[in-house]
């Protein structure tokens, strides 16, 4: 692996670290928003080779494969619930999206600054601290899968150059 490739892979590790830093700084709304951006990015990278843009099903598949809560949590993530929550937050900064209005079986997410989720039949109060930890764990699991699965790695590597990178600039 070239140094350039290593830097691009490291950019994904840095996303998880930035997510944790944002949360640690007390920026709950920013951390929540960036959490969904992280999932979007990973689901884009994992697309089948023949696809160039992601769809709802790609996001849900990535969530169902990689995003796992602690076994003791009263709510375990479901791709459709997380996708609807993502749409609600990113498109309306809300808890309700069109998917919730069309399908009452899709659970609404509310958020609190603690760690333990609270689950009710139609509403889940997501502990942001746990959600952040779970997303970072999902990123790590995805990166491990990329390392171990040559076919997955071959799909991901060409897309890494499209992921936003930041570079330090030193003033003269």
Predicted feature locations:
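Charged alpha-helical initiation segments
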Residues: 1-28
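Hydrophobic packing residues in well-ordered alpha-helices of helical domains and bundles
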Residues: 12, 31, 79-82
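Long, charged low-complexity segments
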Residues: 65-171
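Short, hydrophobic/aromatic alpha-helical segments in well-folded domains
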Residues: 15-18, 34, 85
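Short, contiguous, well-structured surface segments enriched in hydrophobic/aromatic residues
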Residues: 25-69
